[in-house]
Amino acid sequence: MRSVLTISVGLLFGLALSSVAHANDHKILGVIAMPRNETNDLALKIPVCRIVKRIQLTADHGDIELSGASVYFKTARSASQSLNVPSSIKEGQTTGWININSDNDNKRCVSKITFSGHTVNSSDMARLKVIGDD
């Protein structure tokens, strides 16, 4: 009887910890294929509007040069914010966290993130992975 109680308590404790860890989970918001020529209209649309406090960017399959990024919020007047992104990301490299939506009292959900940039040093199109943290 005691072992059944110990196992039950252990399972409940494990479930409680996993739900706490899930609350601050980092989610892949999407992946963008970066063309070889400079392009300024690469959009990552977020199908389910979600509050995102910060993002990280990772380069896969090639190096990426970025010339800008903006985040768009779902509001009555389509508010947007320019992001301070690094000018280049090497293959396999992940940036530090880039803060967005910093006004905690006025939480706005993100509807899309746009990028300007292109692939460098690769015959294939590099992929830009966008990771979000709520």
From Swiss-Prot:
* Residues spanning the membrane: none
Which InterPro entries does the record cross-reference, listed alphabetically? UPF0412_YaaI
Give the Pfam families listed for this entry. DUF2541
What UniProt keywords are attached to this protein's entry?
Answer: Signal
Q: Which residues form a coiled coil?
A: none
Domain of life from the UniProt record: Bacteria
| Secretion signal, residue range per the UniProt entry | 1-23
Database matches in NCBIfam families: PRK10154.1 (NF007541)
Q: Family assignment?
A: Belongs to the UPF0412 family.
Instruction: Please name the HAMAP family in this protein's record.
Output: UPF0412 (MF_01372)
Q: What is this protein called?
A: UPF0412 protein YaaI
Species of provenance: Salmonella paratyphi A (strain AKU_12601)
What gene is this protein translated from? yaaI
